[in-house]
UniProtKB/Swiss-Prot annotation:
Composition-biased stretches (Polar residues): 1-13
Subunit structure: Interacts directly with mes-6 via its N-terminal domain. Forms a heterotrimeric complex with mes-3 and mes-6. Does not interact with mes-4.
Protein's name in the database: Histone-lysine N-methyltransferase mes-2
Any one Gene Ontology molecular-function term assigned to this protein's record: histone H3K27 trimethyltransferase activity
InterPro entries: CXC_dom (IPR026489), EZH1/2-like (IPR045318), Pre-SET_CXC (IPR041355), SET_dom (IPR001214), SET_dom_sf (IPR046341)
Keywords (A to Z) from UniProt: Developmental protein, Methyltransferase, Nucleus, Repressor, S-adenosyl-L-methionine, Transcription, Transcription regulation, Transferase
All residue ranges annotated as the SET domain in the record: 616-737
């Protein structure tokens, strides 16, 4: 076992411009000798960046410590493995004292040593006559195992064969997985392998281009110091962390420097708790050796109130990405209300359910905790209130689940409720009898005022007309405020450069006539996220997630009559396909939570339904993939489509802007990209997973459809719409908005009849219909 470590080196050059071809040479792929083998240390647990001199000194000290522990652990591992191997393969070793290929030995005996063995031999194969489409008979002879298991000699087999026409060969395509809806994908900070770009490509040159884009490094460009597996890593971390007093980032980074092909620094930082689950003894707490990890998984789970998706209401949704948010305010107020029966009720006379029945509680005990009025005493039941936040923080063994269930089951007699939902044999629970459950309800009851009860309660919903007017006034006031800031900036610029300020302001107003009109213009500049804050929503609310967009959605927890909330439309059924519909004009699909008249929630196929609801319902035109006259494969219609009618959605992996840059750097070298950028941030990549829309080709002169970004259930999705009336079997094309460089690359692909399309420019953004206007 060697104690040497791969030599380190710093990057020899900066990242080159994307899209430029790397230098090539004849022969196999080669690696550069002077490579930046390791990425820089990342401040994961440290608040400040560690100085380079201090970091290198700490790394060297940590290396010596880890290597000292490693030698003893590796020796112990070798002894354990040797004993297991001797036990497990002892019988096999007896029967396999020498390695013999019986099949090869018999062939050598029959054919002679050193003779070439022909796998196939063709006989009686006549030439194929192109004018005569009859195919002559042929036979194929091949060698099978020449002896049976019993040792009997087998005969050679001859099988008849014939030649057939190959026919048209479809263009090849990259393997992909079909999906119906885009899936949120986390960033890949570590490149798992270096892609193959062809023979003669210098991997070292490509490495220099990509290393700065992957903060966790590229696997395979540095050698491990020695062999390591999960068991050895667990033993090593447990031994080293006991006495380690340095920076945790230096510790995990040193592990990465010693074993760069095992994991990255970020992966090492979260590996120890997982290793403890597999190898540690029962009851061992990993946080005792990693005190810098303050947030525990269990504590996070206790604070999680609602793990449902904010968009589709699915439990821990994988499509939109699970985002656990803790709202400041509870919907429908901060309190639950329930009716609790009072003792000495004539209707409850009779036998008690047990010796610990709630009926044994006296009215004096109740009066010390609750304050029922005279009417409640006559009715023999009192109205109590439970604070939602208190129940959310309450452990289950203290009765949190019982209180939650009782709120929705007050119609059941209390004794029957306890018999149904309280486990008397549960030793861990503190609530094990009817009397315990009654005392629990009394102890959880809150004495609140009428004013406090109204806090958080939803207001009565205004009419659609009032909500539209409020929203309109709010948007116009925001537009005026933005216009004033813009004009003030132009005046400062004119004063600095000696220009005419009024002229600059007039030119600015003329560039967009909508700024001077009374029409509301909605533009989303960030992804739509439901706001969770106290107080009204406006441009000055710092904690409002809707502040930059200036629009709240139906998912927000603000008041239902919030002037910033998008009110939806009031169109008749089937009319939401023109700019007269404010949902269609704002690039929002209709939603049953806001639109009441357009029948977007209808499920009956016999009635007229909303026409601005295609992506939500996933109602798409039937399409198929086939050879295209433009380039490779293309997308074709199986049914006609009217002008501006929704055809299909562009689905794939929903990735961030940084991840799109990383993938784009690799795709550009293939001259093939399926990344579709969204103006509000992120992109859709259908390279590996997607739908048939990935085959839509580029046509800048006569496109048959256009792409449009729509807000659907709070997220931006890309749809293709017909630019004119389209017939069956017409190819679906749209303008990729190529730059001059990409136009040249596209013409080269057309000449070579490539099966895949060249990369779309990274600068392409979609926010509105891409029309010729």
């Amino acid at each position: 076992m060697s104690n040497s470590e791969p030599s380190t080196s710093t990057p020899s050059g900066k990242t080159k411009k994307r899209g430029k071809k790397c230098e090539t040479s004849m022969g196999k792929s080669k690696k550069s000798k002077n490579l930046p083998r390791f990425v820089k240390i990342q401040p994961i647990f440290s608040s400040e960046k560690i100085k380079e001199t201090v970091c290198e000194q700490g790394i060297e000290e940590c290396k010596r410590m880890l290597k000292g522990h490693f030698n003893a652990i590796k020796d112990d591992y070798d002894i354990r493995v040797k004993d297991e191997l001797d036990t497990d393969i002892k019988d096999w070793l007896k029967d396999a004292s020498s390695s013999v290929n019986e099949y090869r030995r018999r062939l050598q005996e029959n054919l002679g040593e050193g003779r070439t063995i022909a796998k196939f031999s063709f006989k009686n194969c006549e030439k194929y006559e192109e004018n005569d489409y009859k195919v002559s008979d042929s036979t194929v002879t091949w060698i099978k195992p020449d002896r049976t298991e019993e040792g009997d000699l087998m005969k050679k087999f001859r099988a008849p064969c014939s030649r057939i026409e190959v026919g048209d060969i479809s263009p090849p395509m990259i393997y992909w997985v079909p999906i119906e809806q885009s899936v949120a994908t986390p960033d890949q900070l570590r490149l798992t392998h270096m892609p193959y770009f062809g023979d003669g490509i210098d991997d070292g040159n490509i490495y220099e281009h990509l290393i700065d884009m992957f903060p966790d490094g590229i696997h395979g460009f540095s050698d491990n110091w020695s062999y390591v597996n999960d068991w050895i890593l667990y033993k090593l971390c447990r031994a080293a962390l006991k006495d380690y007093q340095g920076s945790p980032d230096v510790f995990y980074y040193t592990l990465y420097r010693l074993w760069p092909n095992k994991s990255s620094q970020r992966e090492f930082s979260s590996a120890f708790p997982v290793l403890c689950e597999n190898f540690a003894e029962k009851g061992f707490d990993p946080s005792s050796l990693e005190p810098w990890k303050k947030t525990k998984i269990a504590e996070g789970a206790q604070n999680l109130r609602n793990p449902t998706c904010y968009a589709c209401l699915a439990y821990t949704c994988a499509i939109h990405g699970f985002k656990a948010e803790i709202p400041i305010e509870f919907p429908n107020g901060e309190f639950y209300n329930a009716m609790l029966p009072l003792p000495n009720n004539p209707e409850n006379d009779g036998k008690m359910c047990s010796g610990n029945c709630w009926k044994s509680v006296t009215m004096k005990e109740v009066s010390e905790v609750l304050v029922p009025d005279s009417e409640e005493i006559l009715q023999k039941e009192v109205k109590i209130y439970f604070m939602k936040s208190r129940i959310a923080k309450m452990p289950i063994e203290d009765g949190a689940l019982i209180v939650n269930i009782y709120v929705f089951n007050t119609y059941i007699p209390f004794c029957e409720f306890v018999k149904k939902y309280v486990d008397e044999d549960d030793e861990e629970s503190k609530i094990r009898s009817c009397r315990d459950a009654y005392h629990l309800m009394m102890s959880m009851a809150e004495n609140v005022s009428a004013r406090r009860l109204k806090m958080g309660q939803p207001s009565n919903r205004l009419s659609i007309k009032d909500r539209v007017n409020n929203f309109r006034r709010n948007q116009l006031s925001q537009e005026k405020a933005k216009r004033k800031l813009r004009h003030d900036s132009l005046r400062i610029q004119a004063l600095r450069d000696g220009l005419d300020a009024e002229k600059l302001i007039r030119e600015d107003d003329m560039r967009d006539s909508q700024r001077n009109s009374e029409k509301v213009r909605m533009t989303a500049v960030t992804p739509i996220t439901a706001c969770r804050h106290a107080g009204p929503c406006n441009a000055t609310a710092e904690n409002c997630a809707c502040r930059e967009n200036g629009v709240c959605s139906y998912m927000c927890k603000c008041d239902i009559n919030c002037s910033q909330r998008f009110p939806g439309c009031n169109c008749a059924a089937g009319q939401c396909y023109t700019k007269a519909c404010q949902c269609y004009r704002a690039n929002w699909e209709c939603n049953p939570m806001t639109c009441n008249m357009c029948k977007c929630d209808a499920i009956d196929s016999n009635i007229i339904k909303c026409r601005n609801f295609g992506m939500t319902r996933m109602i798409q035109k039937r399409t198929y993939c086939g050879p295209s006259k433009i380039a490779g494969n293309g997308l074709f219609l199986l049914e006609p489509a009217e002008k501006d009618e929704f055809i299909t959605e562009y689905t794939g992996e929903r990735i961030s802007d940084d991840e799109a840059e990383r993938r784009g750097a690799i795709y550009d070298r293939y001259q093939c990209s399926y990344i579709f950028n969204i103006e509000t941030g992120g992109a859709i990549d259908s390279y590996k997973i997607g739908n048939l829309a990935r085959f839509a080709n580029h046509d800048s002169k006569n496109p048959t459809c256009y792409a449009r970004t729509m807000v659907v259930a709070g997220e931006h999705r890309i749809g293709f719409y017909a630019k004119r009336r389209l017939e069956i079997s017409e190819e679906l094309t749209f303008d990729y908005s190529y730059s001059g460089e990409h136009q040249i690359a596209f013409r080269m692909v057309q000449t070579k009849e490539r099966s895949e399309k060249p990369s779309r420019p990274k600068s392409q953004k979609l926010s509105k219909p891409m029309t010729s206007e």
